[in-house]
Amino acid sequence: MSDQITYNPGAVSDFASDVGSRAGQLHMIYEDTASKTNALQEFFAGHGAQGFFDAQAQMLSGLQGLIETVGQHGTTTGHVLDNAIGTDQAIAGLF
């Protein structure tokens, strides 16, 4: 049958875990960048400073969105795997 789905549960699980780990790494980058940006406020003032901090805030907002998307992708992959395994087990019980 050409409409069958074949998957490797171990590989899918590893992928979901890896994606979740990447979200954690991105979050650490976010925290580090936000901390360093906030530390600059004491030393960086003047006409261009507000533009810099606005740009940093926009970049951090985008990074936060990426972190949430990557984390959700890992979580969703894990849920789909759990559901696929559950479906396989339920179908096996029918025979």
From Swiss-Prot:
Pfam families tied to this protein: WXG100 (PF06013)
Cellular compartments annotated: Secreted
Gene3D superfamilies xref list: ESAT-6-like
Keywords recorded for this protein, A-Z: Secreted
UniProt entry tagged with the keyword Secreted: yes
The keyword Secreted is assigned to this record: yes
Superkingdom per UniProt: Bacteria
Classification via SUPFAM superfamilies: EsxAB dimer-like
Record-stated family: Belongs to the WXG100 family. ESAT-6 subfamily.
Name of this chain's protein: ESAT-6-like protein EsxC
Source species of the chain: Mycobacterium tuberculosis (strain CDC 1551 / Oshkosh)
Gene: esxC
